[in-house]
Amino acid sequence: MTREQKRRVRAELRACGQGKSDWAGVIALAMDYYEAEDPVCRRLLQLRYLDGMPEERVVAKLHIGRTTYYHKELEALSTVAVYAAAAGLLPSQ
């Protein structure tokens, strides 16, 4: 995942949290996937990006360390990027 792709995914997740993104279907797919496979990733996406909670509060609320937070965040962002690329919303670079 390139820096530009990561920036784009983060921006679209935040916009979706504010009801301003056409990525809603892609994000819903990722949330459904993580509901079954990794609830921590799902909660991280929900709290950090859709609800706009600060990183420090997300770490505390999920009872995880920063290393785990960054690992799970990258995993979740990558999954959203894969769904977005498959839908033609994110060019693969």
Model-derived features: positions:
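N-terminal interaction/assembly modules
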Residues: 1-36, 56-57, 74, 82-93
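Intrinsically disordered, low-complexity sequence elements enriched in Ser/Thr/Gly/Pro
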Residues: 1-8, 46, 64, 70
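Generic leucine side-chain signal with a strong bias for well-ordered alpha-helical environments
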Residues: 13, 44-45, 62
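Aromatic side chains
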Residues: 16, 49, 69-70
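Hydrophobic (often cysteine-bearing) scaffold residues that line and stabilize catalytic clefts
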Residues: 23, 41, 69
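Short amphipathic alpha helix immediately N-terminal
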Residues: 36-53
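Helix-turn-helix DNA-binding module
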Residues: 51-68
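DNA-recognition helix of helix-turn-helix
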Residues: 63-85
